[in-house]
């Protein structure tokens, strides 16, 4: 992705707001982005992970599950006005270094994609052997290793640009760093297979 528009906007805001103002960025960015920013000395800057669910944006803003907060040094207290805002929602606060927060967003989406891929693959198998995926799902949700909130609804592959972008980011980092992203490439392949089925 071209990150220049986000960089330009952050620079514009950094110069335009008072130095004591806290800057919080929610845009999806790759690991290492926040650490590379060249902000004015003394600027309090945080990267906050946002996990949007289509059709439930307001609900998730009002009742967040948790806040994942990327910061320069997670052992230091958050800026007071920002911490006051976050604590008003009475949910867990997870401060971590910038890179961890940036990768946490991608990790969440990868786990979601894994669930979607499992559901799609096994639901199709059900159709071919006379099983009913809807009967199997409750058994999975009662298994504590999987859980009641698991996303186990089959569909037509991975939908939404954020998921696909995160998979691409993982593959690019993996290729550059020499790590194995075979399972991620398999998820992409499975999604394409499901979409081509239509």
How should these model regions be labeled?
Residues 16, 36-48, 53-148, 173-177:
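Internal alpha-helical scaffold of NAD(P)-dependent oxidoreductase catalytic cores
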Residues 26-29:
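Short strand-turn motif at the edge of the Rossmann-like AdoMet-binding core
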Residues 1, 63, 181-182:
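Gly-rich Lys/Arg/Thr-decorated short loops/hinges at beta-loop-alpha junctions or inter-strand turns
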Residues 127-198:
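NAD(P)-dependent Rossmann-like dehydrogenase/reductase catalytic/cofactor-binding core
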Residues 6, 10, 79, 104, ...:
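A general structural signal for well-ordered alpha-helical segments in protein cores
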Residues 4-9, 53, 95, 162:
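Short secondary-structure boundary/capping elements
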Residues 1-22, 32:
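Rossmann-like NAD(P)-binding element
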């Amino acid at each position: 992705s071209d990150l220049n528009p986000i960089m330009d906007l952050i620079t514009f805001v950094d110069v335009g707001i008072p130095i004591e103002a806290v800057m919080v960025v929610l845009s999806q960015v790759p690991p290492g982005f926040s650490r590379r920013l060249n902000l004015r000395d003394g600027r309090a800057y945080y990267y906050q992970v946002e996990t949007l669910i289509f059709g439930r944006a307001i609900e998730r803003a009002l009742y967040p599950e948790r806040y994942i907060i990327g910061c320069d040094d997670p052992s230091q207290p958050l800026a007071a006005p920002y911490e006051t805002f976050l604590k008003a929602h009475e949910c867990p606060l997870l401060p971590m270094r910038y890179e961890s927060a940036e990768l946490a967003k991608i990790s969440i989406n990868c786990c979601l994609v894994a669930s979607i891929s499992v559901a799609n693959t096994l639901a199709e198998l059900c159709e071919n052997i006379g099983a009913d995926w809807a009967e199997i799902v409750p058994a999975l949700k009662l298994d504590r290793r999987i859980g009641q909130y698991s996303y186990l609804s089959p569909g037509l592959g991975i939908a939404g640009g954020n998921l696909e972008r995160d998979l691409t980011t993982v593959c690019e980092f993996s290729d550059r760093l020499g790590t194995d992203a075979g399972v991620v490439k398999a998820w992409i392949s499975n999604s394409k297979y499901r979409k081509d089925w239509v």
